Amino acid sequence: MTFNQPASNFFNRMLFIVTALMAGCNSSNNNQNSTAANNQSSKEPAKAISTNAPVASSPKATETLRIAAFSNLRMVLPILVSDFNHNYPNIKIQITFAPNTALYNTVNANPQSFDIYLSGNQTYPKQMLASVKGVKSSPFTYTRGQLVLYSHKYPMDISPTTTLDQLMLDNKPFSLAIANPENLAYGVAAEAWLVNQNLYNNIKPKIIYTNTLDETFALTDSGKADFGFVSLSQVLNKPNNIALQNVNTLSNNYLILPKNSYPPILQDGIILNHPNTSQIFVDYLKSVKAQDVLTDAGFLPICTSTTILPACK
């Protein structure tokens, strides 16, 4: 079974996305507080332009949607917004990015300040539906995360199970960073994978639990943790690595876990305010067009009976 795709394939596709970002996003997507999305230039890659996205009538007057989004969308969401604005130039979008729990706490305390909430799990939107009055929709799933075993120290050319097994057999000291499974679907998936591979009991003393997925990646990327279970989107979109400097070596530093070897990492959202305009963007986000871009950015598409994406076959 193949556990990793060639890095060149991923990065060729990611170069399309980076080109779109540089061409179409005038405001920085690294600002955690907010980013305004503007019309994308004609240099946007053909892959991000499709005829399969729904096109509703754009509001005649300019409207602003305020989106609260999980931090692992920081690279790809501005690209999607820029493409969305090709059809809906009168809908301006402001994005607030934050780690999963911090984002939930912010939105839950100030639901009137946001129109769409895009969480990193399914739990928080359900809680929002129960606790916030006047919510405008039921939770919806907008993407599915991919789990990888990542290391800045160790090259990995075999399966993730064999990699960790061999370290245990050789009695080598190592540490493994995992996001807190109490509030992060990525942590739940990582623990479940270890259990399924009969590794959890032996590796448990070596686990370092982190409060956020960003912290898990930072700890592993800095080498303070030898290994970490992170999202593929984080590895492909390393901070300060827009030039994709490690194209030739990065593929040896991560292994993609088979998607059927751990519980699905489903990321849900919910509409809080401005339901009509918000629904236009949500429909776009769930379209084949947007799901294709999300797939290139390291996510798995949400497949339906009519989805024609290769990843859905």
Regions found by a protein language model. Give the residues of each.
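Generic detector of short alpha-helix boundary/capping microenvironments
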Residues: 12-13, 137, 175, 257
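Bacterial N-terminal signal peptides that target proteins for export
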Residues: 2-14
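Exported/periplasmic ABC-transporter solute-binding proteins
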Residues: 26-85, 92, 96, 101-108, ...
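Periplasmic-binding protein-like
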Residues: 114-119
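C-terminal motif of bacterial Sec signal peptides marking the signal peptidase cleavage site
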Residues: 22-24
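Residue-level signal for mature regions of secreted extracellular proteins and peptides
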Residues: 18-19
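A short, gly/pro- and small-residue-rich
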Residues: 131-139
